[in-house]
C-alpha cells in the first residue's frame, strides 16, 4: 500500500507562530484570548489530508470534486475565463497543463475538439497515457466526448499505451473510471494490452489487467502465442511467475464480504499424533530437519504468513477499512471475470430503485447480525459499499457524469452513530511562555459541605484515636504533678 501525501498550503504543514506574551502575575484574573486558540472545521486545508490509499481505488482531491460536481456553481455565468485563443484540448494535454485543461472542459468541448489528433493519430488521452500524466488523465475523464477506445496510426489505444509503458496508476484509473473500455482491442500487429504488458514485464499492469477480466488465453494472429508464452519468450521471469500465480489462485478471497479472519484448519499430517511414527521415521525426520537449512524455505500456501497477509489486506482490516471504499464488496475481482467501471456499477444500482437497495441493506444487516459479536465489533468502523439515499432518488434518467462515482467520504458514511454529517471542531492551544508557572488551587479547610465524596471514618479507628488522646492527656497530667512535688520547700514558702 502506497500513501502519497500532498503538501499543505504552508509548505508541508509548517506553521509559523509568534512568540507568546509574558505570563501574567499570580493571583490575577486571566481571561481567555481568542488569539491563543485555533479552531479547525474544514480539515481539507490541513497537511497530510490528501492521500492515495491504493493504485486502483482512491477518492479525488477536493478541487476535483469542486470542478467535477459543482462546476456550474464554481464558474459564474457571464464571467469569461482567461483562455488563450490558440488553446486546444490536445495542446493542453500534451503540455500537462491541468488547469487549462479543466477550464476548457468546464466551458464545453465539442466532439471534434475532443477527438483532435496529432500527426501520429494520437489523442490527448493517448499522449497523457504515454507520458504518464496522471492529473491529465483524471481531468480528461470529466470530458464526455473523449473516446477511450480511440486507436492511433499503429492501432494502439490508451490502455495499450499505458500498459506497455508500465503506468500502473493510469492503467487502474482507465479500468475503474472509464465506462465502455475494451480490454481486448488489438493494435495493428494483433497484440492486446495484456500481451504488450507481458512483453515488457510490467507486473503491476499485468495484475490489474488480469483481475479486471482480460483474456489470458488470447493469442496473436501471427505467432499464435498467449500473453504468458510471450512473457516466457521475452525472458520476463517475474511476469511469468505472477501470471502462473494468478492462474493458480484466481480470486482473492479476503476481498469477499463473507470472508472471516479465522485460522485455517490444520492439515491432516499435523493432526496425527507423534506416536504413530516408528523409530526409523522419527530418526529420518530428525536428520532431515538438521541437515535442511531453514532459511531456504519460503512462505507456504495457507501458512501463518499467508494468513497474516489475508487478514491485513481484507476489507475489514483496520489498515484498509479506514482509507479505502469499495462499491461492490459482494463481487471481488477475479481472473477471467469482466469488472465493470464504477459508473456502470452505480448506474445499475440506481436503475434497481431505492426499494431494492433498502432490501439489500436489510438483508446485509441480518446477515451481519448472525456473524456474532466479534465480527460486529471488527466491522463497526469499516466503510460499507452502496449508493447513498440522496443518489437513489435521482432515478436512472439522470445523466451520470464520470466524476459522480467519486463521492465525498462524508456522503458514504451512512452507518455512523450520529445521523448526518458530524464535523468535529478541533481547538489547538498555543504553548505558554517558558517562565510560566501554573497556579495551584488552594486547599479547602473543611470538606463537610462540599459535594465531593469523603473518606469513610470507621468506629474502631475513632475509639482508638480517643483512647490515645486520653492516654497522652493522663501522662501529661502525671508529669506536671511529679514536677510540682520535686519543687524545693523554700520556694513553696515564698
Swiss-Prot record:
Compositional bias annotation for Basic and acidic residues: 371-382, 440-451, 459-487
Region of interest (Disordered), residue spans: 1-80, 349-494
Pfam families: Ank, Ank_2
Gene3D superfamilies: Ankyrin repeat-containing domain
Phosphoserine modified-residue sites: 405
Biased composition (Acidic residues): 30-42
UniProt feature coiled coil, ranges: 459-488
Signal sequence interval, chain numbering: none
Extent of the ANK repeats: 84-113, 120-150, 154-183, 189-218, 223-255
Keywords for the protein's UniProt record, in alphabetical order: ANK repeat, Coiled coil, Phosphoprotein, Repeat
PANTHER family xrefs: ANKYRIN REPEAT CONTAINING, ANKYRIN REPEAT DOMAIN-CONTAINING PROTEIN 33B
Name assigned to this protein: Ankyrin repeat domain-containing protein 33B
Biological source species: Homo sapiens
